[in-house]
UniProtKB/Swiss-Prot annotation:
Record protein name field: Glycogen synthase 1
EC class of the enzyme, as a word: transferase
PANTHER family in alphabetical order: ALPHA AMYLASE DOMAIN-CONTAINING PROTEIN, GRANULE-BOUND STARCH SYNTHASE 1, CHLOROPLASTIC/AMYLOPLASTIC
Database matches in NCBIfam families: glgA (TIGR02095)
Origin species: Geobacter metallireducens (strain ATCC 53774 / DSM 7210 / GS-15)
Record's catalysed reaction(s): [(1->4)-alpha-D-glucosyl](n) + ADP-alpha-D-glucose = [(1->4)-alpha-D-glucosyl](n+1) + ADP + H(+)
Binding site for ADP-alpha-D-glucose: K18
C-alpha cells in the first residue's frame, strides 16, 4: 500500500501534556507509523503547561480562523514542534481563552464549564489547519470525545472542503465512560444543523453527545483491546451507548497498545537499584530490598511483596481492595501502593498504614522513578479494575518478572494468561467476579504458589518475561485499520487505483 498522509487530532500527547493513557498512544504511535514511511502530523492544544522553549516550538506565520457557529469566528496562533526522538510534527493551537489554564480538563476535580466549546474548537481547528500548512491528509484519526466531532464535521459542514471533505475517518475510543455530553445548544456551535440532533445522531437523553456523533459518523472505529471492543457492546460497559456500538460492530476493531521497551526494561532501567534479566534474576532480589527500604518495611526475602501503582478511583477497583485489605494483610505478606485519587482513599489507606506498619505503606501522589522501582521490586502486581480498556502496568509487570494479579476485563484479560497449576502455562493470576471475595481468593492463590510452588513461580516468571507487546506490532495493525477505512470510504476499485493493492 502506498504510504499515507495522516492527520491525528487529540487532546493530549506525551511528553507535552498527559492525564491518561490516551497521551501515551498519541505520543508513541505516530513515531512508529512514521518509521513505516507514513507522513503523520499531530494537532493538539497548547496548554499552559506546554513550555515553548523547552520543546523548541516555533510559531507559524499567520492566524488560524476557526468558525464556531453562533459564537462567531475564533482565532488562534499555531506553534510547531516535534515528538521527541522523531521528525513527527506536532501543531499546537494557542488560544488563551480556552487553553491557558492550570488543568487540561478540570481544576480541583471540577470540570471546566466551557469544555464543550474548548474541544469543538479543537476539532474544527484540526480541520482548518490543513489549509494553513498545505497538507491534504488521506485520512483523519480522532481520539475520544474531545475530537469525536471531526468525523461528524467531515460528513457535514466540511463535506465539500478541498482538504478534508470526503476523507476517511478513524475514531479511537480509549474509555467509553467519558463521552462529552453537553447542553443541546452545542449544536449551534457545531453549526451542522438540528436535523442531526436525533436518536440516530448526536441526541442522547436531551443533550448533545459528541462521542455518540463520532461513533455514528466515523468510517471505522477502534478501541485499545479486543476484549474492550466486545465489552463496549454490553450495557455494563457501554455507558448508555452500547446500542450504538452494536450497530457499528462490523466496523469496530480492537488493537492492544504496545509498550515502550526503551523505557520499561529491567536490563537498562536507570531508576532501579540493580539491573537484571530473565537469565539472571539476582538483581531483582536487590530491587526488592531497595523497595522495602524505600517504603520503610522490614527487609525480608522470605515474604511475598505486592505492589500497586494506580489512580485510586472506583474504576481501578480500590473499593473492593479496601474491603479485602484486612484479610490480605492477615497473611504473611507485604504491600506497597503508589497513587492518588478520591480523597477517602487517602485517609482509608493511611489508616491501614498505621494499623500495619510492618506490612503496608502508601505514597500518595505519582512518582515515575518510584513506579519503576515498584515494578522491579515487587513479586506480584495488583490490578483489580472494574474495567480496563487496555492497561499498561500489567504489561510492564510481565517484562519485569512481577506477576500480575488482575480482574479479567478488557486489556487485562487480553494480555495476561491465567496460571494453570497442572501444565505451568500462564503469566499471572486472574479473577472474574468484581467482589472482594474473588480478589482475596486470587491473592491467596498467588501467596500459596509463592510459598509452596517454587517450581511454578520460576516457570511463571520465565513465561512472563518472554512476553512482548511491541508498538511495531500495534502500528502494523493500525496501518491495516487505515487501509480498511480507505477501502470502505473509496471502494475497492478506487482504493486500488490510488494506493495499490497492498
Amino acid at each position: 500500500m502506498k504510504k499515507l498522509k495522516i492527520l491525528m487530532a487529540a487532546s493530549e500527547c506525551v511528553p507535552f501534556a498527559k492525564e491518561g493513557g490516551l497521551a501515551d498512544v498519541v505520543g508513541v504511535l505516530p513515531k512508529h507509523l512514521a518509521r513505516m514511511g507514513h507522513d503523520v502530523r499531530v494537532v493538539m492544544p497548547r496548554y499552559k503547561r506546554v513550555d515553548r522553549e523547552r520543546y523548541g516550538l516555533k510559531q507559524l506565520p499567520g492566524v488560524l480562523v476557526v468558525p464556531m457557529g453562533v459564537i462567531g469566528n475564533q482565532y488562534c496562533g499555531v506553534w510547531e514542534g516535534r515528538i521527541p526522538g522523531s521528525d513527527v510534527p506536532v501543531y499546537f493551537l494557542e488560544h488563551e481563552g480556552y487553553y491557558d489554564r492550570d488543568g487540561l480538563y478540570e481544576v480541583n476535580n471540577e470540570g471546566f464549564l466551557d469544555n464543550d466549546n474548548r474541544f469543538v474548537f479543537l476539532s474544527k481547528a484540526a480541520l482548518e489547519l490543513p489549509k494553513m500548512i498545505g497538507f491534504e491528509p488521506d485520512l483523519l484519526h480522532a481520539h475520544d470525545w474531545h475530537t469525536a466531532a471531526i468525523p461528524v464535521l467531515v460528513n457535514t459542514t466540511y463535506a465539500a472542503d478541498p482538504y478534508v471533505g470526503g476523507k476517511a475517518t478513524v475514531l479511537s475510543v480509549h474509555n467509553m465512560q467519558h463521552q462529552g455530553n453537553f447542553y443541546e445548544g452545542l449544536m449551534d456551535v457545531l453549526g451542522i444543523g438540528w436535523e442531526h440532533f436525533t436518536f440516530l445522531g448526536l441526541e442522547n437523553n436531551g443533550e448533545a453527545n459528541l462521542l455518540k456523533g463520532g461513533l455514528y459518523h466515523a468510517t471505522v472505529l477502534n478501541t485499545v483491546s479486543e476484549g474492550y471492543a466486545r465489552e463496549m457492546q454490553t450495557p455494563e460497559y457501554g455507558w448508555g451507548l452500547d446500542g450504538v456500538v452494536r450497530e457499528r460492530a462490523a466496523d469496530l476493531y480492537g488493537i492492544l497498545n504496545g509498550v515502550d521497551y526503551e523505557d520499561w526494561n529491567p536490563e537498562v532501567d536507570p531508576y532501579i537499584a540493580a539491573r537484571y534479566s530473565a537469565a539472571d534474576l539476582s538483581g531483582k532480589k536487590l530491587c526488592k530490598r531497595d523497595l522495602q527500604r524505600t517504603f520503610g518495611l522490614p527487609e525480608r526475602d522470605d515474604v511475598p511483596l505486592f505492589g500497586m501503582v494506580s489512580r485510586l478511583v472506583k474504576q481501578k477497583g480500590v473499593d473492593i481492595l479496601a474491603e479485602a485489605i484486612h484479610r490480605i494483610l492477615a497473611l504473611d505478606v507485604q504491600f506497597v501502593m503508589l497513587g492518588a485519587g478520591e480523597p477517602w482513599t487517602h485517609f482509608y489507606f493511611g489508616d491501614i498504614k498505621n494499623a500495619y506498619p510492618d506490612k503496608f505503606n502508601i505514597f500518595v501522589g505519582y512518582n515515575n522513578p518510584l513506579s519503576h522501582q515498584i515494578e522491579a521490586g515487587a513479586d506480584f502486581f495488583l490490578m483489580p479494575s472494574a474495567f480496563e480498556p487496555c492497561g499498561l502496568n500489567q504489561m510492564y509487570s510481565l517484562r519485569y518478572g512481577t506477576l500480575p494479579i488482575v480482574r479479567a476485563t478488557g486489556g487485562l484479560d487480553d494480555s495476561v494468561e491465567n496460571f494453570d497449576e497442572k501444565t505451568l502455562v500462564g503469566t499471572g493470576f486472574k479473577f472474574w467476579s468484581r467482589d472482594a471475595g474473588a480478589l482475596f481468593d486470587t491473592v491467596g492463590w498467588a501467596v500459596h504458589t509463592w510459598y509452596h510452588r517454587k517450581d511454578a513461580m520460576e516457570r511463571l516468571i520465565a513465561n512472563a518475561m518472554a512476553k512482548r507487546f511491541t508498538w511495531e506490532d500495534a502500528a502494523a495493525r493500525y496501518e491495516d485499520l487505515y487501509g480498511r477505512a480507505l477501502r470502505k470510504r473509496l471502494g475497492e476499485k478506487e482504493f486500488a487505483r490510488r494506493y495499490g493493492k497492498g
